[in-house]
Amino acid sequence: MKKTLLAAGAVLALSSSFTVNAAENDKPQYLSDWWHQSVNVVGSYHTRFGPQIRNDTYLEYEAFAKKDWFDFYGYADAPVFFGGNSDAKGIWNHGSPLFMEIEPRFSIDKLTNTDLSFGPFKEWYFANNYIYDMGRNKDGRQSTWYMGLGTDIDTGLPMSLSMNVYAKYQWQNYGAANENEWDGYRFKIKYFVPITDLWGGQLSYIGFTNFDWGSDLGDDSGNAINGIKTRTNNSIASSHILALNYDHWHYSVVARYWHDGGQWNDDAELNFGNGNFNVRSTGWGGYLVVGYNF
């Protein structure tokens, strides 16, 4: 959940090649030659998007595409499909049956038939990032739309680099104080670096970081038991991925760092009815991903 570009989609969405060293007459077969998709099993450890640390294993559908003026990445998760810790609620145990995130970008250059490139900036996009958590009640639902400007950057190196900056409109947010209003901004940077051929596949490094700032959520939220604010105005999530990709199978190991993840104030003391606990929203967690491209 909430991982964005964890598996082979990261490699393929940021690069133009889908196969690795495949001859033209020996390419693998997929359902579509432009809509690339996979089904994944994802194991998460110590994720920090909420007030309590979460571990779970879930099923995921992932898709990515880049065709003419349309650039897309997205996924849909069935949370806790294969189980999780006591704080992880999902499809089978009265939690959310669906969590999804999509990142469509629309090329301004191609839609206007205008070359807007200059310096290292190759192409410009109307960039979007939409997040939806279905939940089973109001306190379990989220609907967030980031919208803004994106670009691809020529680094002169064997790597791909893109940046997006967004304004955020917050609809539902698990009952938080910033619902149904414009509330803050996000800067996203993504990069992809091919490393080497390994064991018949391609080993790559993918990184992306979300910087969220300018929200009023911290100011508008109440105090925790220990006197500090329960929420924050800013947060950071930074992911670092090693991905091994084959024609149909892909494997990823992900390390992610959160600073006040989900805009929860680290060390705030809370009680949800089962005793006091301290928020641990700053620190490291990780994911393991196994997926099949079809």
Curated annotation (Swiss-Prot):
One of its GO terms (molecular function) is nucleoside-specific channel forming porin activity. Disruption phenotype: Loss of susceptibility to contact-dependent growth inhibition by CdiA-STECO31. It is a multi-pass membrane protein. It is found in: Cell outer membrane. One of its GO terms (cellular component) is pore complex. GO terms for biological process: monoatomic ion transport; nucleoside transport; symbiont entry into host cell. Disulfide bonds: none annotated. The keyword Transcription does not apply. It comes from the Bacteria. Residues 1-22 form the signal peptide. Gene3D superfamilies: Nucleoside-specific channel-forming protein, Tsx-like (2.40.230.20). The keyword Membrane applies. Keywords: Cell outer membrane, Ion transport, Membrane, Porin, Signal, Transmembrane, Transmembrane beta strand, Transport. Functions as a substrate-specific channel for nucleosides and deoxynucleosides. Has a greater affinity for deoxynucleosides than for nucleosides, and does not transport free bases. In addition, constitutes the receptor for colicin K and phage T6. (Microbial infection) Serves as a receptor for CdiA-STECO31, required for adhesion between E.coli expressing CdiA-STECO31 and this strain. Belongs to the nucleoside-specific channel-forming outer membrane porin (Tsx) (TC 1.B.10) family. This is Nucleoside-specific channel-forming protein Tsx. It comes from Escherichia coli (strain K12). The lineage of its organism: Bacteria, Pseudomonadati, Pseudomonadota, Gammaproteobacteria, Enterobacterales. The gene is tsx.
